[in-house]
């Protein structure tokens, strides 16, 4: 596997020097300063490449080229936004970048309720609390019809949770959910968020699938022409939230995506933390079934709690993800590709590390502090080395 590292550009507290010292060789980044829907100029791409190359690294994967909301809702200037997206792909390919990670989650990117969940050892993790989220939906956002998405017990727990909140607690929870986490290109106020939700009135799972299919039928032929591989990231959490449909959450969704535009360029990001939140997602089976379409991997683990929809980020080798078996399945796919003449390793990045040690005293991007990811990368690297020595000695 190619060892890569997510970097949020010049404003990231983690520097490219840090990335190199962590042992990564590839950088996963994006042009975050360019507004959603606009073309990424070749000059801007090359400038970012030069910054990365100056530190002895390479820009391996784009994460992400954001998809404008009007594409997802199939409204407004969606065709123009798609044309701009196509041109961005051409420009990236012209610069030699050939993997693009993206997602099709409505409105919000990945979602958490607690960005500073303290673990028993004193480190901090990200957490999604189903009851806290219910309290937000029912009593802060006050989304009409939200009660249908929760059991009577969850509604009662959410009411008790909300009643115990201070104004500061309410502001913090609201900000955590709608203000935009790292990688999300847009944040909202409550009123803006309500207006954005209203744009999805009448868009169910079938309609969102059709909107994504329209996008893919326009994008994948361009990717084929320029030799670029698209890698869709799963929903996080992998289920409907806020009354919004989610369509990249299960192995059935992966099959639908494959069949919708059946091209090797229409592929997946295997994010074990996102898919792994669901106990019914068999990660190894997913890799074995769609191995030739997996162009990028995010390796992390989560820990499901008493409420099966509540989880927190675990250590990379702890939690509900069997990282040993996952890495073995990825290496099996790499071996198959190399036997067929494709010597390119599959890019992997350690996802979401715990905030720990010296990083507890620094301002960091939630989930993206240096030391926790350094630990995760070292652990996954060790698993990979042991597996290669034991089962895959011929792998490069």
From Swiss-Prot:
GO terms for molecular function: ferrous iron binding; manganese ion binding; mannonate dehydratase activity. Pathway: Carbohydrate metabolism; pentose and glucuronate interconversion. Its cofactor is Fe(2+); Mn(2+). This is Mannonate dehydratase. The gene is uxuA. Keywords: Iron, Lyase, Manganese. It is an enzyme of class 4 (lyase). It holds the Pfam family UxuA. Belongs to the mannonate dehydratase family. Its EC number is 4.2.1.8. Catalyzes the dehydration of D-mannonate. It catalyses: D-mannonate = 2-dehydro-3-deoxy-D-gluconate + H2O. GO terms for biological process: D-glucuronate catabolic process. InterPro entries: Man_deHydtase (IPR004628), Xyl_isomerase-like_sf (IPR036237).
